[in-house]
Regions:
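N-terminal glycine-rich phosphate/pyrophosphate-binding loop and immediately adjacent elements
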Residues: 1-114
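Generic, well-ordered alpha-helical scaffold segments in large soluble proteins
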Residues: 3-6, 152-156, 168, 207, ...
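Beta-strand segments within the central parallel beta-sheet cores of soluble alpha/beta enzyme folds
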Residues: 13-15, 68, 163-169, 210, ...
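Active-site-adjacent bridging/hinge elements
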Residues: 15, 179-184
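Acidic/polar loop patches that form or flank catalytic/metal-binding clefts of enzymes
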Residues: 35, 48, 164, 220-221
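Conserved active-site and cofactor/substrate-binding residues in soluble primary-metabolism enzymes
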Residues: 47-50, 144, 148, 199, ...
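Rossmann-like flavin
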Residues: 79-179
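Helical element adjacent to the flavin cofactor pocket in flavoenzyme catalytic cores
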Residues: 185-221
Length: 221
């Protein structure tokens, strides 16, 4: 899309009969399913724009997609022992964690603040592409970004249920917290709200293709 916007002649060859790859939907009976999208991070708010929103705005597609704020991150269900909806809003999320370990209330807040701090450094990597990446500009990434996530979490939290709640969502990354780099863990738990997309992920792909063709690009299926 950037090439097309710069005036280049661009041909996109797609093996499927619709655009999008993992960003597609399909219909079975009365239901429409998303192929891969569970929730979309990085949209943020008007006051605090996320990195994904910034990219969509740069590509002139943000206003062509309708985002719906998501109230729950996920629900944990352990046999018949526990059914726990995990809220997406920061205050409610922290309150849920603290209810299982009141004695670690302050440490839970400190750990979440650390998650958000390293996430902000992660976001700035995009803003400073082409700039100098060093320990002065990105101290947390250099200091603890490559340490195992569980090792960092152990320094703040001891309660196994709180650790479990923090670890469940990381299944989407396919790497357990004991070896997952902390940078990816902290980035995943920067609670700047998640969103669904009206029409599913296909709406994102369709908006990108529409803008691509508007800029002179050609798509062949």
């Amino acid at each position: 899309l950037n090439l097309a916007k710069s005036g280049k002649k661009v041909l996109l060859l797609e093996k499927h009969n619709i655009p999008g790859g993992c960003g597609t939907t399909f219909i079975r009976g009365r239901y429409e399913f998303d192929v891969g999208l569970h929730t979309l991070w990085g949209i943020g708010t008007d006051e605090k724009k996320g990195h994904v929103r910034k990219i969509f705005e740069e590509l002139d597609v943000y206003d062509k997609i309708e985002f719906i704020r998501q109230d729950e991150l996920y629900t944990i269900n352990i046999l018949d022992k526990l059914e726990l909806p995990i809220p997406f809003y920061k205050d409610k999320f922290l309150a849920t964690l603290q209810s299982f370990s009141p004695e670690e209330k302050d440490n839970i807040i400190k750990f979440q603040e650390l998650n958000e701090a390293i996430a902000q450094e992660f976001y700035r990597l995009y803003d400073e592409l082409g700039g100098e990446i060093n320990s002065e500009n990105f101290p947390l990434i250099f200091e603890i970004g490559t340490r195992p996530a569980m090792e960092v979490m152990d320094e703040y939290i001891k309660n196994p249920i709180v650790k479990m709640i923090y670890s469940v969502y990381l299944g989407t990354l396919g790497i357990p917290p004991k070896i997952l780099p902390y940078l990816l863990f902290g980035f995943s738990y920067e609670m700047n709200t998640g969103h669904h997309v009206k029409g599913g992920a296909q709406s994102i792909s369709n908006a990108l293709v529409e803008e691509f063709e508007r800029c002179g690009g050609t798509v062949m299926y």
